[in-house]
Amino acid sequence: MANSNTNQLHPLGATTSQTFITALNHTAASTIAINFRELIKEPKELDEASNYLYQALLDDVVAGIFIETHHLRKTGNLAALDGVGEENLESAFHICEMPNLDIFGISTAKKQMDCTCPNCDRLVAAARFAPHLEKCMGMGRISSRIASRRLATKEGSSASTSSTSTYLQSGGNTGGTDDEDDVDWSSDKRKKKSTQSSRNNGSKKNNGKTF
């Protein structure tokens, strides 16, 4: 074949080579179609022209398959094109039939979302996060009242503690003790009792006299 060397791939890119071959084959085929009558007259030239057309078509098909395979190899789709072998067919189409799982074995149960409270750092369910945060930060009406009461109680307890400590300190400075206070109280009580008994006796004597 005289023109078979012109159809060989040049050291260019795959797409450029295919475009070049397609253009060259189109030109050669057009030339053969124009000179078809003259080629019929010469059996030798007719044989060469038919061989040229066959080789051009074969090269075009082989180049197309090569470029497509190369593209699939680079993109990683060659394994998908090959498919799954018969030995791996059963494992490839295994269907999961367990409860709460889909056909691929993925859980279908809804997982409850938890949120962390920024105030107390506790894990709270997402559905109860808003009311918990409102109560925890004292932003609601009832919560604000409770928080105010707690604050007032805290202030009252601190005030009573401070007054008690002040009283104890003042008692210690004057030198008074609990025992002395008890003695004074008992003596006053005895005096009151003796005075009352003397009054009762005097009234009885006066009632017994005659005038």
Swiss-Prot record:
One biological process term in Gene Ontology: mRNA export from nucleus
InterPro entries, alphabetized: SAGA_su_Sgf11, SGF11
Location of region: Disordered: 149-211
GO CC terms, sorted: cytoplasm; DUBm complex; nuclear pore; nucleoplasm; SAGA complex
Biased segments, Low complexity type: 157-166, 197-211
Gene3D superfamilies in the cross-refs: Classic Zinc Finger
Entry GO MF terms: transcription coactivator activity; zinc ion binding
Subcellular location: Nucleus, Nucleoplasm; Cytoplasm
Domain notes: The long N-terminal helix forms part of the 'assembly lobe' of the SAGA deubiquitination module.
Family: Belongs to the SGF11 family.
Name of the featured protein: SAGA-associated factor 11 homolog 2
Organism, as annotated: Drosophila grimshawi (Hawaiian fruit fly)
